[in-house]
Amino acid sequence: MNSETIHIENLSIGYPGKNDVKVVADGICAGINSGELTCLLGANGVGKSTLLRTLSAFQPKLGGEIRIQGREIETYTDKQLSRVISVVLTEKCDLRNMSVTELVGLGRTPYTGFWGVLTQEDKHVVEHSIALVGIPHLAHRMVHTLSDGERQKVMIAKALAQETPVIYLDEPTAFLDFPSKVEMMQLLHHLSRRTDKTIFLSTHDLELALQIADKIWLMDKANGVTIGTPEDLSLNGSLGSFFARKGIVFDPESGLFRVDNEYASQVRLSGSGQRYAMMRKALQRNGIFAGRDVEAETHVETDGCTEGGDKV
């Protein structure tokens, strides 16, 4: 059974001002386990980055507790915290004249002392971290020559080289194409299992998070933070109500979202297999509701002819 690495009790986050305090979210109670990938979802401006910065100790909390490995986060020194939490940010780093191995080696900074000289053990950790994310072939490449996906893997390798039990990532798939997004999410899930680390990330890639994450945090201004597995949040209606808006419908059977088209007409559609599915999709995209049980004068057969019907 995975152990609880992070414990959050009645957490309040936001920004203190001169005359008042802006509370972004409060009353957050949760635990984040080792060996799990947890994804934070929410609309722009809801406070995902504020929550992530607070959990990372980049900004102070307004109230409540954040405990990492049983210890209140505020009792850690900066040096101690650098051996507990590693963070991968969204911003692209414009690095020139630095190789992949050298950048990953910076993850050893909490252990190398003032001069930053890597020991053989440090070099072994760097090499192992590069191997874990599957980029040994990039080890001697210059960072500025890498693609966005390659660069993100390097930053994850750097976080692994830091050897912390907790890794936070701020929208790690933000600049990636779809195949790279899938690969990145699968990699992070695999790493959480293989290394038994606590990996927590914010993302806008809803569909991928629902298919890959172990736990989901849904954050909105009305309800604060709702937490559960994708399956639990589907069964209790949290996902459907969280994203309820015109044009979007949550399908509880697949656990995914689909576009809810407005229909001007309908046809009875016969057939089976992929041809039937693609024809139904094409018709519905064009405002025509189609299905086997639809009662309509127009009948379309996708894989043959029927009396009074059309062959497609």
Would you name each region that the model predicts?
Residues 64-72:
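Conserved ABC transporter NBD signature motif
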Residues 41-43:
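The feature captures the beta-strand-to-loop junction immediately N-terminal to the Walker
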Residues 142-146, 150:
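Conserved ABC ATPase signature
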Residues 6, 23-27:
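Conserved structural motif at the start of ABC-family nucleotide-binding domains
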Residues 105, 120-138:
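Conserved ABC ATPase "signature" region
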Residues 167-171:
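Catalytic Walker B motif of ABC-type/P-loop ATPase nucleotide-binding domains
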Residues 56:
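Helix-to-loop junction immediately C-terminal to a conserved catalytic motif
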